[in-house]
């Protein structure tokens, strides 16, 4: 992976690698050359535990910058106390929060139609745009 990244560096400002779920060899290969990691989690207890483990591994591998995106947030469930608020997730994980994506049926519709969500006038599409601006 390090060799591949070094070959790509001269031609690209950003190289994004989508890691497989879990912490197996695919994950370890993906972070081998990382200078930054963006951990994406949902506000569910099991997902937050997994994200915390991932952040620990990233820290142990001396990844200099770790950011967080909280995905599939449902404000109605947060208000009823059925889902953890984003602020609590950020506090538990203790890394820089660069954005949240609220659950949006337009994501499913766009995915099924094969259309880009970023072109949609929807909450999730705007969230993606904001997160992209914070990455750059």
Task: List each language-model region with its residue ranges.
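Conserved catalytic-core segment of NTP-binding enzymes
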Residues: 2-10, 14-103, 109
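C-terminal boundary of histidine-terminating zinc-finger modules
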Residues: 111-126
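C-terminal alpha-helix
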Residues: 127-135
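Residue-level detector of flexible, active-site-proximal loop/helix-junction positions
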Residues: 104-105, 114
